[in-house]
């Protein structure tokens, strides 16, 4: 269930609220285009600016709109363990298929603190947990040994979204666990290199815009057809880089609006609209790929 091309879905807003109509359209779009799973309320979904009740409602909406046609992985991590447990229990009750759990951010726990945080969540819930290691945002790196300990101790800890930018981490974590461990790239530009050494797929930003091709690339890689997969990787390299010319999800949400995938470009402060010169660069790249006119 948790392999291949999984989209880190944007959250559409309109008039200060979650835009149900656009959200349903996005989920239908990904079902139609062959996306393997949806992460809802993750970093790309602006989870940090959702209220607790909005967070719960967004997950419930996604489960409802997916209607068991595509797995829903709910972003329910937090830097307060009790909050992460509450959100995860709520997602489990709503019918989510899995949970994405970010390493606690800002408070910079030790490796033992990270272990105890995820231990508490794993013991209080039964939903499959995918841990999320992104030190550039959290300020702390969950080491492979800490992940391996959690993976060994708790059967509902099934994998990790790895976003350190270090491809060698894949081999290291497999050596500490087993080849079946679910390792997912957290960086579109590193998806293919990571899958070449054993990762199972990606939680992708670019998938918001080109889901069919990202899904095909991942399927080819899982089948060992790396030369064919590399052709897709090379084709979209420029898009992968352009989607990070400003803080994610600002460029991808702007692109989705320009492509007509959502009805409003609205973002929540402190995220703000793109600089005009960067938006022009984004438009140029989207035109090059035939995504807008």
Swiss-Prot record:
Its EC number is 4.3.3.7. Transmembrane segments: none annotated. Keywords: Amino-acid biosynthesis, Cytoplasm, Diaminopimelate biosynthesis, Lyase, Lysine biosynthesis, Schiff base. SMART domains: DHDPS. Gene3D superfamilies: Aldolase class I (3.20.20.70). Pyruvate binds at residues 44, 203. One of its GO terms (molecular function) is 4-hydroxy-tetrahydrodipicolinate synthase activity. The keyword Amino-acid biosynthesis applies. The keyword Zinc does not apply. GO terms for biological process: diaminopimelate biosynthetic process; lysine biosynthetic process via diaminopimelate. The record marks 43, 106 as: Part of a proton relay during catalysis. It catalyses: L-aspartate 4-semialdehyde + pyruvate = (2S,4S)-4-hydroxy-2,3,4,5-tetrahydrodipicolinate + H2O + H(+). GO terms for cellular component: cytosol. It is an enzyme of class 4 (lyase). Catalyzes the condensation of (S)-aspartate-beta-semialdehyde [(S)-ASA] and pyruvate to 4-hydroxy-tetrahydrodipicolinate (HTPA). PANTHER family: 4-HYDROXY-2-OXOGLUTARATE ALDOLASE, MITOCHONDRIAL, DIHYDRODIPICOLINATE SYNTHASE. Belongs to the DapA family. This is 4-hydroxy-tetrahydrodipicolinate synthase. It comes from Persephonella marina (strain DSM 14350 / EX-H1). The gene is dapA.
């Amino acid at each position: 269930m948790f392999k291949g091309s999984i989209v880190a879905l944007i959250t559409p807003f309109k008039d200060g609220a979650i835009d149900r109509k656009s959200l349903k359209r996005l989920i239908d779009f990904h079902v139609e285009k062959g996306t393997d799973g949806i992460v809802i309320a993750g970093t790309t979904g602006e989870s940090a600016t959702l209220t607790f009740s909005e967070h719960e409602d967004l997950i419930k909406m996604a489960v409802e709109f997916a209607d068991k046609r595509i797995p829903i992985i709910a972003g329910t991590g937090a830097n307060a363990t009790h909050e992460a447990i509450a959100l995860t229990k709520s997602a489990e009750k709503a019918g989510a298929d899995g949970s994405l759990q970010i390493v606690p951010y800002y408070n910079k726990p030790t490796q033992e603190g990270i272990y105890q945080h995820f231990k508490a969540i794993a013991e209080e819930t039964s939903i499959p947990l995918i841990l999320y290691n992104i030190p550039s945002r959290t300020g702390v790196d969950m080491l492979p040994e800490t992940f391996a300990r959690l993976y060994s101790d708790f059967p509902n800890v099934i994998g990790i979204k790895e976003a350190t930018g270090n491809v060698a981490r894949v081999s290291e974590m497999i050596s500490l666990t087993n080849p079946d461990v679910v390792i997912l790239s957290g960086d579109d530009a590193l998806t293919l290199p990571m899958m070449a050494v054993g990762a199972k797929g990606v939680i992708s930003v670019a998938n918001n815009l080109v889901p069919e091709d990202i899904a095909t690339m991942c399927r080819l890689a899982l089948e060992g057809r790396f030369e064919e997969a590399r052709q897709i990787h090379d084709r979209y390299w420029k898009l992968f880089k352009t989607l990070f010319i400003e803080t994610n999800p600002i460029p991808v949400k702007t692109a989705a609006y320009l492509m007509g995938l959502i009805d409003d470009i609205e973002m929540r402060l402190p995220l703000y609209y793109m600089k005009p010169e960067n938006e022009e660069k984004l438009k140029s790249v989207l035109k090059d790929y035939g995504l807008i006119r």
